[in-house]
Design a protein with these regions (language model features):
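A short, hydrophobic C-terminal helix/tail in secreted or cell-surface proteins
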Residues: 187-192
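AAA+ P-loop NTPase catalytic core and its hallmark functional loops
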Residues: 2-186
Length: 192
């Protein structure tokens, strides 16, 4: 990303806020460090809700799609061969920290234990990039949101194959958990 390029997502004029949108928007708009773990069934709009909350709040947004293969190099940075030279490239976590942006760890329950490198980041501290001997502190406004189809406990019913049980210490780094709104309490009027 170009350091001067805005990473604020575009507002979708067709988006209709629902569920916990106002809660997510409040977290994003506050500019405070408040990691939130957002759970819900696949396809119910978790990621889009967070993106649109960032658009409304005019907050920069970095999305990282997590897989079982995601590791420290993918998240924090790595060396890459560019024009015949080996060059360090910051990962999306470092870029979001330095810009004071909102970082979305999408589908975090697909991750392996390789994401434990994020522990200091989730504690609100900086992170040491040992490969380049550099410490990165989070800029004002940086925060982390994570989405998951499960609550980090895996999928016993087989609906979400590939999801993993997340380390309890890792889950505890998210002071806010946003769960799907239950509509079972709604009563619909009957037509007579």
């Amino acid at each position: 990303h170009n350091p001067t390029e805005s990473l604020v997502p575009n507002k979708d004029p067709l988006y209709v806020p629902f569920g916990h949108f106002n809660d997510i928007y409040s977290i994003v708009k506050s500019g405070l460090y408040y990691p939130a773990f957002v759970t819900g069934l696949s396809g119910n709009g978790k990621t889009f809700m967070i993106e649109q909350a960032c658009a409304k709040a005019k907050r920069e947004f970095f999305r990282v799609n997590i897989t079982v293969e995601t590791d420290e190099d993918d998240l924090l940075g790595h060396y890459a061969l560019i024009d015949g030279n080996t060059v360090w490239q910051d990962g999306p976590v470092v870029k979001a920290m330095e810009r004071g942006a909102v970082l979305l760890l999408d589908e975090i329950d697909l991750a392996s234990s390789k994401i434990m490198c994020l522990q200091p980041v989730l504690e609100g501290n900086g992170v040491f990039l040992k490969k380049v001997n550099r410490f990165v502190s989070p800029s004002k406004g940086f925060t982390v949101l994570a989405t998951a189809n499960t609550k980090g406990k895996g999928s016993e019913d087989g609906r979400f194959i590939g999801t993993n049980i997340l380390n309890e210490a890792f889950l505890e780094r998210f002071p806010i958990t946003v769960e799907p709104v239950s509509y079972t309490h709604l009563t619909l009027p009957t037509m007579s």
